[in-house]
């Protein structure tokens, strides 16, 4: 069975969906999950990327031992479109998907996960998409097909609006309340209870 593989590779986890094309329509036939990725230049970045792709693909192939991935598209956190980093990631995907003797892989595309998400949600025309997770990025497209990105600098530099950043700022507010630097508020107990903490010592 000749398969198409689509990957959503974020910093927390990676998903793989396999499909076959029948009468011009993609029919999903399997899904798998693996660990997250980090920037390729980060310590162990390439190893993590390889592991994320290979693990999620093998999980998705469990029910299709004779399946051969013919083409793969990866939307990955931290990949800039049109850069040497993109080419490097595409070579790594080829390595990760060299499964068995008959690899069959003829086409690989790796790009930023914001681009695959925008095309998946809004294939044509104007639109805008925001991703808020470990990091944050926004991608917009106008009526002429021109795209513009905002954010995507990484959580250490600028994670404004990311789920991590919002949670971090909320936790910081509760610490100021505990210190008396801010008036106490029910939000402090709500956040601490969600964390399973019943005192300032437990927060540490």
Regions found by a protein language model. Give the residues of each.
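Short glycine-aspartate micro-motif
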Residues: 4-8, 69-73, 109, 127-131, ...
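Short beta-strand-loop/turn "lid" adjacent to the catalytic site in phosphate-handling enzymes
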Residues: 38-41, 57-97, 109-110, 119-122
